[in-house]
C-alpha cells in the first residue's frame, strides 16, 4: 500500500474556535509542525496553511484549511490536485464523537459518520477512500447538545487525555508514512 504524502487537520478557523473539541485535527497537525520545528505558511490558492515535515525518510505535506469545517473539501481537493497526490495517500485527522477523550483510531475508507468535514470531503472526492485519524472527544449524551459540545472547550482532564492520544498517534505516524498501515493500526489500537 502507498504511504502517506499528505496529512490534513480538520477544524474551524478563528481565535474563538482554537481550543474547541472540533479542532482536534488542527491540534494534531499543529503538534507535528511544532515538534519538527517547522512553520505554517498561508497558501491562498489552496485555501489553507501548509507546512512540510520530514517523517520516516520522506517529506510529507501538512494542510490546515482556512475554510470552516463544513467546507474542508475545497481546500483538500485543491491540495490533492496541486501536489498530484492520490486520496489513498492522505490522512485526515478529525474529532470523533463516538470515542471518549483519550481514544484514537486509524481507519481507511468509509462514510462520513455525520462529521461535516468528512461529509464535504467525500462529496467532493466522490468516495471515502482515504485514511482517517479519529480523535475521541466524547459525546454529550443527547443529539440536541452535539453542536454546543463540539464547539465547546474540553475540560482539563479531557485535554490531558486528548493530548496523550495525539502523542500516541504521532508515535505510529512513521509506520503509516512508510505504508505500513496495518502495523500502525496494530500499535495504536493495542492498549498496553
UniProtKB/Swiss-Prot annotation:
Its EC number is 3.1.1.29. GO terms for biological process: protein quality control for misfolded or incompletely synthesized proteins; rescue of stalled ribosome. The keyword tRNA-binding applies. The record marks 95 as: Stabilizes the basic form of H active site to accept a proton. It is an enzyme of class 3 (hydrolase). It is found in: Cytoplasm. Its main location: cytoplasm. CDD domains: PTH. InterPro entries: Pept_tRNA_hydro, Pept_tRNA_hydro_CS, Pept_tRNA_hydro_sf. One of its GO terms (cellular component) is cytoplasm. It comes from the Bacteria. The record marks 12 as: Discriminates between blocked and unblocked aminoacyl-tRNA. TRNA binds at residues 17, 68, 70, 116. It catalyses: an N-acyl-L-alpha-aminoacyl-tRNA + H2O = an N-acyl-L-amino acid + a tRNA + H(+). Keywords: Cytoplasm, Hydrolase, RNA-binding, tRNA-binding. The active site is at residue 22. NCBIfam families: pth (TIGR00447). Belongs to the PTH family. Hydrolyzes ribosome-free peptidyl-tRNAs (with 1 or more amino acids incorporated), which drop off the ribosome during protein synthesis, or as a result of ribosome stalling. Monomer. This is Peptidyl-tRNA hydrolase. It comes from Xylella fastidiosa (strain M12). The lineage of its organism: Bacteria, Pseudomonadati, Pseudomonadota, Gammaproteobacteria, Lysobacterales.
